[in-house]
């Protein structure tokens, strides 16, 4: 979208604008700079929301945005419809009017195996008379379908799929999704009016965080990212939509005109070229992962590759879409009443299955929340055996009318925990039993309480054995202090033996005793000892997350860590101070404040400090051996997860990027690499290394 020279100039402009003050800007100055300021903000939106490679801090971005708002407030006649300030409308939408799509949003025909794909290819070759077909193959995003219309370069209307002919006008809600440009230079391609198809998505990690938050707040959970996205784009208040972390990928131009003349198949000849054009115009597209395949054999190979690596992709995909790449053939191939004949979806192995609820048990979480867990007849879903599923809370059970003995539809999508989608009430025999909630804690026997406004019953005994165990498990978990060897089973065993009664006890473990416990040899004891020692030097945000403060996930933990020098500093923050930090509201601030004003918690922090656990941020940034170097990973690594590799690179001063470009210094190639390898091979400045070379580079075995 922006050349390297243009980006350099925009970064220079950024510095100029950051030094401006609204008081020094008169009418003439405002008129001369306002469009450049808007373009600078659009550029930083593109870097952040499309490339995920910001070049300024959040504080600097906010300063630029405030300057633009101040200028427009001072001179309101200078406001334009595509100004970045116009993304969040102030009005509430009570009714979404119905609007007709320029072209129908048809479904795709589905295929489930190689034979189906070969049959599709045969039909296409017969209808076109060609011996071999060029196909464009891309992931099938599992989100909420949308249609966008741009006229004279401005975003005019956005709609839901609806029944395919008519959808709901959700323009205001789509404007707050920053990966949807408010303006795009279609005119530079000779296009006056264009209709684009896309999908609104929620990244898997953001979806997980949303559901964790909703669970804590006693709100109904979303079954999967698709449901969350579909529900979010139909919220009445665009400000609430903006909080959901939505993204939009566009994947098809369905209509394009110049002076009333249709350009598809004439000027716009290939689907892959159209995706490249949308990518260059600043849209989020499957450009990086779209592959042009010469014949059906290449298509099948690419589909198999993606089925193997689907769980490593940050978004939910439920298959691949195969399209004839030559748009001029579309008219000859035509449509059925249901789907186009020039495209087909290859569906991955199902992530849903029906099974029976055998029993329900009640578990106690680290904050005392009582969670009902259904024990299932084991069933395979997406290659994994599922034998239990959380029922979350009493409201969830009542809402779905779940009973012991019921046949239920269970979904497991990627990293998302298994979820009961629905009860198959038609399968009931009359022998099903209602689920009765306990009155007392199943661990310590204390009476349970249900706080006002919450859906969750809680045990308020802070010394409840189950809570203590869960707090220790959470502290040692991968996303917190990452103490390998201190598994859930090990924590429970050590607690039962009296070796672990609190989090600080981890750093007081007597390894002479552990050596004599069945199942612990010298090697496993030494590994555990080393893992515990290494955990003392984790980044501060991991320690904050590991403390298990209610409502504080990884993102909030990072926010808190960046606001202080040392952990103890948080006890000096008032609730008002905490609410000034990004994404921390009243409820979260109150929990944080209460935690750091609890004597027992402060005593625990002091003990951790005395035991050698790092409770401060580094005093100064060390220039690591990878300082200034940009890395991209492709394929699966044997040594560690992609997230761990990223953490190592960043700890040594390097950066990990999502996409291949001239800015990349190293591409690290693991098993079954994707299309990034082919792209990197075309850029001579990128050094391509294997996993072994990468490990030598970072000095690790």
Swiss-Prot record:
Gene3D superfamilies: 5' to 3' exonuclease, C-terminal subdomain, 6.20.10.30, BRCT domain, DNA ligase/mRNA capping enzyme, Helix hairpin bin, Nucleic acid-binding proteins. One of its GO terms (biological process) is DNA repair. NAD(+) binds at residues 58-62, 107-108, 138, 161, 199, 323, 347. GO terms for cellular component: cytosol. CDD domains: BRCT_DNA_ligase_like (cd17748), LIGANc (cd00114). Keywords: DNA damage, DNA repair, DNA replication, Ligase, Magnesium, Manganese, Metal-binding, NAD, Zinc. The keyword Zinc applies. Its cofactor is Mg(2+); Mn(2+). The keyword NAD applies. The active site is at 140 (n6-amp-lysine intermediate). Transmembrane segments: none annotated. It comes from the Bacteria. Zn(2+) binds at residues 441, 444, 459, 464. Its EC number is 6.5.1.2. DNA ligase that catalyzes the formation of phosphodiester linkages between 5'-phosphoryl and 3'-hydroxyl groups in double-stranded DNA using NAD as a coenzyme and as the energy source for the reaction. It is essential for DNA replication and repair of damaged DNA. Belongs to the NAD-dependent DNA ligase family. LigA subfamily. This is DNA ligase.
């Amino acid at each position: 979208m922006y050349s390297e020279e243009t980006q350099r100039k925009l970064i220079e402009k950024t510095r100029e604008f950051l030094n401006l003050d609204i008081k020094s800007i008169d009418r003439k100055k405002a008129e001369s700079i306002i469009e450049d300021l808007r373009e600078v903000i659009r550029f930083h939106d593109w870097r952040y929301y499309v490339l995920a490679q910001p070049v300024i801090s959040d504080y600097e971005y906010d300063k630029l945005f405030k300057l633009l708002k101040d200028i427009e407030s001072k001179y309101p006649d200078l406001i334009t419809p595509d100004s970045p300030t116009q993304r969040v409308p102030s009005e509430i939408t009570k009714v979404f009017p119905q609007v007709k799509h320029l072209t129908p949003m048809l479904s795709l025909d589905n295929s489930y195996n190689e034979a189906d794909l070969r049959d599709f290819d045969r039909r296409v070759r017969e209808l076109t008379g060609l011996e071999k077909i060029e196909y464009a193959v891309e992931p099938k995003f599992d989100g909420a379908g949308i249609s966008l219309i741009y006229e004279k370069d401005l975003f005019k209307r956005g709609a839901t799929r609806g029944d395919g002919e008519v959808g709901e006008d959700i323009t205001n809600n789509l404007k707050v999704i920053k990966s949807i440009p408010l303006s795009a230079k279609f005119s530079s391609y000779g296009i006056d009016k264009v209709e684009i198809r896309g999908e609104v998505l929620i990244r898997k990690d953001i979806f997980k965080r949303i559901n964790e938050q909703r669970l804590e707040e006693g709100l109904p959970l979303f079954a999967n990212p698709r449901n969350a996205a579909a529900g979010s784009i139909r919220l009445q208040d665009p400000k609430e939509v903006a909080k959901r972390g939505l993204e939009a990928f566009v994947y098809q131009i369905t209509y394009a005109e110049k002076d009333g003349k249709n350009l598809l198949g004439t000027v716009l000849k290939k689907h892959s070229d159209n995706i490249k054009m949308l990518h260059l115009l600043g849209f989020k597209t499957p450009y990086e992962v779209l592959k042009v395949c010469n014949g059906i054999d290449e298509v099948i190979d690419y589909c198999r590759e993606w089925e193997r690596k689907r769980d490593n992709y940050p978004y939910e995909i439920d298959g691949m879409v195969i399209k004839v790449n030559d748009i001029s053939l579309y008219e000859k191939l035509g449509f059925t009443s249901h789907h186009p004949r020039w495209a087909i979806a290859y569906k991955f192995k199902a992530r849903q299955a029906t099974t029976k609820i055998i029993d329900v048990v009640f578990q106690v979480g680290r904050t005392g929340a009582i969670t009902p867990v259904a024990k299932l007849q084991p069933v395979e879903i997406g290659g994994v055996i599922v034998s239990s599923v959380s029922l979350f809370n009493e409201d969830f059970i009542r809402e779905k009318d779940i009973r012991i003995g019921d046949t239920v539809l269970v979904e497991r999508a990627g990293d998302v925990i298994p979820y009961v989608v629905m009860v198959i009430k038609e399968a009931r025999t009359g022998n099903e039993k209602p689920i009765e909630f306990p009155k007392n804690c199943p661990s310590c026997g204390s009476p349970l309480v249900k706080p006002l406004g919450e859906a969750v019953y809680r045990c308020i005994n802070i010394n409840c054995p189950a809570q203590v165990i869960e707090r220790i498990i959470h502290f040692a978990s991968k996303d917190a202090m990452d103490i390998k060897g201190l598994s859930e089973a090990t924590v429970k065993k050590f607690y039962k033996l009296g070796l672990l009664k609190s989090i600080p006890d981890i750093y007081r473990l007597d390894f002479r005793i552990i050596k004599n416990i069945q199942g612990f040899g010298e090697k496993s004891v030494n590994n555990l000892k080393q893992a515990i020692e290494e955990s003392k030097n984790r980044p501060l945000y991991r320690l904050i997350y590991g403390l298990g403060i209610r409502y504080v996930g990884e993102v909030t933990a990072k926010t808190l860590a960046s606001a202080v020098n040392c952990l103890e500093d948080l006890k000096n923050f008032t609730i008002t101070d905490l609410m000034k930090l990004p994404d921390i509201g009243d409820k979260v601030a109150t929990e944080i404040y209460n935690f750091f004003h609890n004597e027992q918690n402060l005593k625990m922090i002091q003990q951790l400090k005395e035991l050698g656990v790092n409770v401060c941020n580094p005093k100064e940034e060390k220039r690591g051996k990878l300082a200034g170097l940009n890395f991209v990973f492709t394929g699966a690594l044997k040594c560690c997860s992609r997230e761990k590799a990223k953490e190592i690179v960043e700890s040594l001063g390097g950066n990990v990027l999502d996409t291949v470009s001239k800015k990349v210094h190293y591409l690290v190639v693991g098993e079954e690499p994707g299309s990034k390898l082919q792209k990197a091979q075309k850029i001579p400045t990128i050094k391509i290394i294997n996993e072994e070379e990468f490990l030598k580079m970072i000095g690790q075995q």
